[in-house]
């Protein structure tokens, strides 16, 4: 996937992804309208130690993030935007365990619209696929882990996973690529409280206003650019409650 195509894919799926993520929000208490220093948002995901990935896995996922969401002069890439942090926290939680979904046999291959038909959880898929991808990269003439390969070589591997021409041991490379692309998109466009979309960079890129609760002053103002910065579940810097 070229940088231009990747950006087009991200923008084209943005509106659906900003409202449907794998994460489940905590309860947000308080009354509307919100006032500065009066909110009570759920706890934010903070970057730091990894909850699911090993350090080697995290380095690989961050490298993958910067190839799927490459940085440019306007917007940070997937690594800086926190996509790997988002995926890490998701895999460590209910999403990683497929919690709440029916995952009992028999497993019959269905249509793409029916979703995964397997007992393999997202956490298992990532753990096994990342290990297989590492073996594939180290066994190639380069002999290096994915994170240390040149960007051109990284793109070749991703293109091979997408097309099915790169085969990973014991896992379906195409299935992993589809899951990775979906999760990267969600991490890039989800509310920053879940670890990705750091500083609301993706929302600013597409002009998405976020979780503002009142647009009454703008309902009748057609073809005007909305001038206010986006707002997340936790508010924005000047809305953040002061710590006593």
Locations of the language-model features?
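Mature-region segments of soluble proteins
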Residues: 2, 45-46, 56-63, 74-244
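Basic side chains
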Residues: 6-7, 11, 154
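C-terminal segment of N-terminal export signals and the immediately downstream linker at the start
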Residues: 3-8, 20-63
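Sec-dependent signal peptide hydrophobic core
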Residues: 13-17
